UniProtKB/Swiss-Prot annotation:
Pfam families, alphabetized: Kunitz_BPTI
GO CC term (a single one): extracellular space
SUPFAM superfamilies, A to Z: BPTI-like
Expression (tissue specificity): Expressed by the venom gland.
Subunit-level organization: Heterodimer; disulfide-linked. The A chain has phospholipase A2 activity and the B chain shows homology with the basic protease inhibitors.
Organism: Bungarus candidus
Protein name: Kunitz-type serine protease inhibitor homolog beta-bungarotoxin B2a chain
Length: 85
C-alpha cells in the first residue's frame, strides 16, 4: 500500500473513532422518571422528557428537587434526554 493510501486509511480511522461516541450516546436514566409537580417553592416553567412521546414537554415545576427529569429549557432537556442513533 502506498504512503498516500496509508494516510487516507489513518484519517478515516481517526474520523470514525471521533464520531462513534457521539452517535451511540444514550439518555440519562432520570429522563425515564415522571415529572415532579409538587409545590415546595416558587412555581416556574420547566421541561421534562416524556418517554412515551419521545420528546420534551413543558410543565410547572415547584422546586422540590424530586428527580433529575426537570430542565430550565427545552434545549437542555433535549441535549440530556434524546437518544442519538
Amino acid at each position: 500500500m502506498s504512503s498516500g493510501g496509508l494516510l487516507l486509511l489513518l484519517g478515516l480511522l481517526t474520523l470514525w473513532a471521533e464520531l462513534t461516541p457521539v452517535s451511540s450516546r444514550k439518555r440519562h436514566p432520570d429522563c425515564d422518571k415522571p415529572p415532579d409537580t409538587k409545590i415546595c417553592q416558587t412555581v416556574v416553567r420547566a421541561f421534562y422528557y416524556k418517554p412515551s412521546a419521545k420528546r420534551c414537554v413543558q410543565f410547572r415545576y415547584g422546586g422540590c428537587n424530586g428527580n433529575g427529569n426537570h430542565f430550565k429549557s427545552d434545549h437542555l432537556c433535549r441535549c440530556e434526554c434524546l437518544e442519538y442513533p
